[in-house]
Design a protein with these regions (language model features):
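Short acidic-glycine-tyrosine-enriched beta hairpin
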Residues: 107-126
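Conserved short histidine dyad/triad with adjacent acidic residue
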Residues: 57, 72-88, 121-126
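A short, N-terminal "cap"/entry segment at the start of jelly-roll beta-barrel domains
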Residues: 1-69, 155-179
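Hydrophobic/aromatic beta-strand elements that line small-molecule binding cavities or substrate pockets
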Residues: 73, 116, 129-131
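A short hydrophobic beta-strand segment most commonly corresponding to one strand
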Residues: 119-120, 129, 135-156
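Intrinsically disordered, low-complexity regulatory regions enriched in Ser/Pro/Gly/Thr
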Residues: 69, 87, 95-97, 111-112, ...
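Short histidine-centered beta-strand/loop micro-motifs
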Residues: 63-64, 82-88, 111, 130-133
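Short, conserved beta-strand element in jelly-roll/cupin
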Residues: 74-79, 87-103, 145-147
Length: 179
């Protein structure tokens, strides 16, 4: 290697690598969260909120930094009449805890009852869906699980098409306050 090429290589070797130390620090944070985060998330410690889709309680998700797991989300919905309607890339598993009803997925009607598992497939362009409670005297209740691992690769987005009839708030306010 000639002199100028060797000098350039030496300069490059002396350049400060800021990415690797950042990666190490982020991995340390993730490991610490896994070691010290909550293993049991208690329902009584998890508040109910009304959002554009339903009455919801978030057990864990990326924004909740006190849990041991950060690769998934788990949330419970209570649906009195029907949920809001929205579209996202799918990849959601919903276990029906109580009640009965149906879900419309891309225009197709699918009945369900307590003990059933609803699967929203991963689809290019997303999956439009809305959940309906069949019993006006008793709300339906279910637990949803979704993995975060693929989101960045799918260009994940959520498009709200219709709000729940129980939503009376301001979307902008709920984003600012988390309520």
């Amino acid at each position: 290697m000639k002199g100028s090429g060797r000098r350039r290589m030496n300069r490059e070797l002396r350049a400060k690598d800021t990415w690797y130390p950042r990666l190490i620090k982020d991995l340390e944070k993730m490991n610490q969260r896994a070691e010290t985060g909550k293993i049991v998330v208690r329902g009584k410690d998890t508040p109910w909120m009304q959002n554009r889709n339903a009455k919801v309680r978030y057990y864990f998700m990326p924004y909740k930094t006190d849990t041991a797991l950060q690769t998934m989300q788990a949330f419970e919905h209570v649906i009195h009449r029907h949920s809001g309607k929205h579209r996202h890339q799918g990849g959601l598993a919903i276990f029906v805890l109580e009640g009965e009803g149906y879900t419309v997925v891309d225009g197709k009607h699918h009945d369900w009852k307590a003990g059933d598992l609803i699967l929203l497939p991963i689809m290019p362009g997303g999956v439009s869906h809305q959940h309906f409670n069949a019993n006006p005297k008793k709300p339906a209740r279910w637990l949803a699980l979704i993995t975060n691992a693929y989101r960045a690769h799918l260009g994940y987005e959520i498009v709200q098409i219709e709000d729940s009839p129980d939503w009376k708030g301001s979307w902008e306010k709920s984003v600012r306050t988390g309520r």
